[in-house]
Amino acid sequence: RFGGRVRFFISGSAALNQDISRWFDAMGMQIAEGYGMTESSAASTVNRIVAYKNGTVGWPLPGMEFRIAEDGEVLMRGPGVMAGYHNNPAATAEALDADGWLHTGDIGEIDDRGFLKLTDRKKDLFKTSNGKYVAPSNIESTFKGLCPYVSQLLVHGNDRNFVSALVTLDPEAIVGWAAANGMEGKSYA
C-alpha cells in the first residue's frame, strides 16, 4: 500500500495525464479526478472509488445535471451554479441560458454510464471550410504521445478544406535515435 493509510488521491484544476493516472492505478492507488468551475462552487463531478473510470472526471455530484450541447459544449446546472456575475448582466447572459444551464466553454462527452469526459476548450476549436469542428489539442497530444521525437506540434486548418500540422523535432531525441540506428553524425535537416 502506498503511504500507509492513504487510499486514493483527488485531482482537479487541470486535466490529469492518463499515463500518470494509469501508473498510480497499476500500483493500487486510484486518482479520483474531478471537475468544476468557480461559477459552479468548485466541484461539480468526481470519480468515486466505487465508480471509477480512468480518463473521465466522473459522475455529477448530487443535485448537479450535465448535458452536451449540439456543438459539444458541456452544460451544467444545479444548486451550486451561480446566479450570475456581480454587476455584469452581459457576461451573465453569455454564460447562463434561460433554462439555467451554465455554458462551461469546455467540450466533452457523456458515456452510456454517465461518466463525463472533457476533450477540449470550445475557444480552441477551429472550423474547416466544410463545416467540421476540429479539436487541435487532441490531435497534438495524441501525436506527441505516439512519437517521442516531436518537440512541438501545431495543428491548423481554420477555413480550409484540410487540416495540417507543423512539426518540430526534439534535437536530443533525434540524435539519440540516429545513434541507435547507425546514422550517428548525419543531419536530420
Regions found by a protein language model. Give the residues of each.
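Gly/Ser/Thr-rich phosphate-binding loop
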Residues: 1-52, 65, 148
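Residue-level signal for inorganic ion chemistry
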Residues: 13, 66, 114, 143, ...
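Alpha-helix/helix-capping structural signal
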Residues: 14-15, 80, 172
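Conserved ATP-binding/catalytic segment of the ANL
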Residues: 60-69, 73-128
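Adenylate-forming
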Residues: 81, 115-142, 174-188
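Core catalytic subdomain of AMP-forming adenylate-forming
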Residues: 96-112, 129-155
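Conserved loop-to-beta-strand segment in the C-terminal subdomain of adenylate-forming
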Residues: 158-181
